[in-house]
Amino acid sequence: SKYNLVPLGMSLKMCLLNKDVVEKNFDKEFDKFKVKKSSKKFLLNKEQEESLAYIRNIGNNYNVTVLEGVTGSGKTLVYFKRIKDFIDRGFQALILLPEIALTNQFNERFKEFFGSESAVWHSGTSKKNKSIIWKGIKDGKIPIVIGARSSLFLPFKNLGIIIVDEEHDASYKQDEGISYNARDMAITRASIENIPINL
């Protein structure tokens, strides 16, 4: 609430769900989100290898790194490799996308790499799926979320890294209701959690 000068209650409302969700057992639903070993090999080119090595060398504490490259240049694969570093060590990851329309295409690439469904969070996600994702994130049973701005407010149990894809996109700005820039708030959250954020 200090970040965007709104009452604390309004900020908390963005993070909380009905108490019935907290008490429900969704264990069977979480299986589809478990990362599996993909049968497909994903090889990086020289530039991608150099970018990944650079990001890894910066470390796992709070830092802001911008990965430059036009759309389709291979940034996503670098993101995925970096996310896997954290998932293999028991951490969770958040991938922010500027547009809901991008999630389907991104999700297909995600399935190829991680061998599992992704937990997708945006305004079009059903109430039931939101309940499952919220509980899974809170309990540490869902490792990765792909989402729009509002996914920033999910109660991650052990968040290890945040990725902001297309960080320059104007869609990250919200002017209605609580006004904020999701990219800037993602950087703030990474700072608070002392974790890296890649833009």
Protein language model regions, located:
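Accessory, non-ATPase domains that flank or precede helicase/AAA+ motor cores in DNA-metabolism machines
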Residues: S1-L199
